[in-house]
Amino acid sequence: MKKEFNVHKTLVVPDEANLFFVGDIHGCNDLLEDALKLAGYNSKKDCVVCVGDLIDRGTQNLQVLAKFLYNPRFISVRGNHDQFMIVGDWANWMYNGGMWAMNELDADTIKNIAEDMAEKMPVFLTVRHRGKKFGVVHGGVPFTYKECGNEVETPVWDNLIAQVEAAKEDPHDHPGYHIEPYLWDRDVIQEIGFYLSKNGEEHPYFQRYAGFKEKYMVEVPEVKGVDFVFHGHTGVPYPLLYKNRVYLDTGGVFNGQLTVAQVNDETGKITTFTTDKIDSCGVQRILQ
């Protein structure tokens, strides 16, 4: 099986290291450094996990790639932008911010970096740290439905991975077909937005979902088998927790707001640190 369809890896983080999750970086290395500083990151021992989309749209793509490909304390799942480069989807990649590679690199270098990305950036990442288990996948964990009616299945993390691993071996199917929903999903976050708009959330971002028909509302289940599962891909106005699904893409490349998250060992709650263009102290939140 080609490495571009590398499905899953497990990362075991030493207890003495702190663990941080970061949203879509999109080539903004300086912003990443600022966000990690806010969170109290220690470069000598701590570990950083990204939810994908390391590249495109920003101007420091090579610096970001150097961190996550060649520094063992940095690891990332692949996002849809990373996948463009890995599989050589040139039309979509160039249209969505990939021209930096054409301007800065020759063809052989692009190929070599893409091969390293394919090997080191899985679709799913399981992270074990201080007795907790976390999942990371870029777009989301999409809905699947029971055979009868429109009732949604409750996803189980390890089962999802096993299903995709098995499906990629089907000689009659395109091996990338089964991973695309996990890189691109937005259906779940739309249902979450609809739920929040119906329950008093007044932020304009969520009000765009207010027109959804309530009778078609789908209850978003938690993902079983992990304490939390972290996503990016869909921009949110602030770090968002729903059930045990965490959305961290706060639009850093567009608005200067990049988010880093850390799970508190004692309370089990998530603290987030978001950079701010105006206030160098950023914004700290505890997700409820």
Which residue ranges define each predicted feature?
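N-terminal active-site segment of His-dependent metallophosphoesterases
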Residues: M1-A66
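Beta-strand-turn-beta hairpins that frame and shape the catalytic cleft
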Residues: V13-F20, T126-G135, Y242-N244
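A general structural motif
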Residues: E16, S43-D46, N71, G131-K132, ...
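Active-site neighborhood of phospho(di)ester-bond hydrolases with catalytic His/Asp-centered motifs
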Residues: V22-G23, V48-G52, S76-N80, V137, ...
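Active-site environment of divalent metal-dependent phosphoester hydrolases
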Residues: H26-D30, D56-T59, H81-I86, P142-T144, ...
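Active-site neighborhood of divalent metal-dependent phosphoester bond hydrolases
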Residues: N61-F143, E147-D185, Y195-K198, E202-G211, ...
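Short, charged, surface-exposed secondary-structure boundary motifs
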Residues: M85-V87, G256-N264, G282-I286
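Conserved beta-sheet core of the metallophosphoesterase superfamily
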Residues: Y209-D276
